[in-house]
């Protein structure tokens, strides 16, 4: 990850900006990729180790530019600018609800009155004009006198339905939930319960978000949520392939008597199947809700069915007995599970995995590990804390620092020991390896620590 830029004067920050811009320009030029442009999508650069220089340079540009803006604004104007940021989401709520972008030609222009007429529902030309012009002020639309031209940013709301779903989720569901955090605290205190979050307070009900999504009139929001999760996971920093190819030595688990990998809350088994394809000596069991594992079992490729099984299971209950050979270990793999839950319930989930854990077994959590203050660039740090606040407002869940994970591991019986945290290059989720307290992993297994390139020890950032 890019380290924090510590420059604190105008010319030092400008130099950082020029240096990082030069590196990004050089990388794109060498790869024969287009340079950044307001008139075209961003260059398509795969998230992998080979392209690390590009992403490092891009992060450094954003970090230096944001520092520069804060510096020249000064503290008072920085606070005032921040106080108006919610207005952007307010405009976006109107844009998403009435699908303004769908009523603008992909190539060409239209008028505010034509958009209002196409939308109907009592939407006036004045409302369209005011919200469009506000969005245009931060680059989402481009306006011309008497008409409105669709700018490349908003084309994505028409051509990329998964991104549209994520933006909808942010503006229409998360924005009111975040605003209702103080109301929820006033009603319930600082709660560990999912039905006492900002989300429930924002809709005037004591209800958990996922419970609300299962109600008949919550189906649209549930569908948008599913699309948003699919979109954020596809090819980006949350892509599940980072868990498969991101530096964890899965091949070592096949040594000796081998391991059974139990994918706890594994959905339809996409991660287990990808691992099974790559590591033919390992066996897998996918656990999830009955209807989910039925889909997984149906879609599992025939050549994997002998090594990938499916079982309905509630991860708040004890693990069932597993058929293992003499000496064969068990790996309990849980991806993106704990962050949905407060410490109270995350501890209960880990406790069910700790009970019955043997010295040859281990737990691998695939979760965000929030860096401690000052360890990474401010943009990265803010992004991690943004995710944490999303979990708080929607579910009373939490993205955790390494020390927060360790506190959970120390609180269960038997106690657990954090062995290492591996952070895949360009991936957002770390691989957190845990064993019984007192277990020493073989020296060979300990050879991969921190980043996928084997540096930085257990911290991984």
From Swiss-Prot:
Induction: Expression is positively regulated by the cercosporin cluster-specific transcription factor CTB8. Expression is also affected by nitrogen and carbon sources and pH, and is also controlled by another transcription activator, CRG1, previously shown to regulate cercosporin production and resistance. PROSITE patterns: SAM_OMT_II (PS51683). It comes from the Eukaryota. It holds the Pfam family Methyltransf_2. Its EC number is 2.1.1.-. Pathway: Mycotoxin biosynthesis. Belongs to the class I-like SAM-binding methyltransferase superfamily. Cation-independent O-methyltransferase family. COMT subfamily. This is O-methyltransferase CTB2.
């Amino acid at each position: 990850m890019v380290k924090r830029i510590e420059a604190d004067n105008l010319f030092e920050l400008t130099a950082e900006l020029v240096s990082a811009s030069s590196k990004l320009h050089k990388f794109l030029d060498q790869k024969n990729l287009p340079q950044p442009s307001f008139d075209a999508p961003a260059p398509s650069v795969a998230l992998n180790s080979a392209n690390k220089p590009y992403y490092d340079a891009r992060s450094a540009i954003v970090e230096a530019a944001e520092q520069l803006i804060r510096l020249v604004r000064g503290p008072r104007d920085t606070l005032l600018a921040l106080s108006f940021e919610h207005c952007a989401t307010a405009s976006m709520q109107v844009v998403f609800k009435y699908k303004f972008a769908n009523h603008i030609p992909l190539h060409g222009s239209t008028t505010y009155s034509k958009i209002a007429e196409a939308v109907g529902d009592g939407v006036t030309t004045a409302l369209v004009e005011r919200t469009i012009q506000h969005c245009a002020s931060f680059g989402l639309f481009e306006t011309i006198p008497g008409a409105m031209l669709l700018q490349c940013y908003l084309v994505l709301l028409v051509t990329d339905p998964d991104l549209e779903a994520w933006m909808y989720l942010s503006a229409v569901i998360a924005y009111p939930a975040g605003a209702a955090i103080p109301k929820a605290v006033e009603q319930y205190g600082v709660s560990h319960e999912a039905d006492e979050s900002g989300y429930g307070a924002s809709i005037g009900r004591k209800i958990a978000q996922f419970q609300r999504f299962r109600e008949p009139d919550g189906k649209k929001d549930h569908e948008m949520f599913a699309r948003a999760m699919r979109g954020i996971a596809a090819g980006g920093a949350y892509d599940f392939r980072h868990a498969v190819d991101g530096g964890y030595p899965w091949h070592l688990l096949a040594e000796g008597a081998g391991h059974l990998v139990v994918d706890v809350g594994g959905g339809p088994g996409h991660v287990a199947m990808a691992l099974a394809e790559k590591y033919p000596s390992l066996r897998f069991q996918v656990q999830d809700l009955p209807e989910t594992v039925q889909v997984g079992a149906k879609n599992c490729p025939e050549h994997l069915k002998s090594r990938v099984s499916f079982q309905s299971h509630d991860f708040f209950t004890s693990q069932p007995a597993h058929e293992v050979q003499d000496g064969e270990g068990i790996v309990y793999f849980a991806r993106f599970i704990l962050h949905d839950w407060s410490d109270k319930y995350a501890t209960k989930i880990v406790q069910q995995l700790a009970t019955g854990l043997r010295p040859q077994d281990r737990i691998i959590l695939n979760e965000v590990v929030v860096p401690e203050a000052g360890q990474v660039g401010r943009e990265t740090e803010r992004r991690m804390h943004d995710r944490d606040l999303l979990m708080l407002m929607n579910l009373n869940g939490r993205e955790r620092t390494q020390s927060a994970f360790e506190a959970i591991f120390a609180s269960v019986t038997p106690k657990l020991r954090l062995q290492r945290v591996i952070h895949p290059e360009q991936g957002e989720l770390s691989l957190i390896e845990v064993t019984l307290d007192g277990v020493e992993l073989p020296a060979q297994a300990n050879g991969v620590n921190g980043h996928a390139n084997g540096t930085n020890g257990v911290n991984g950032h």
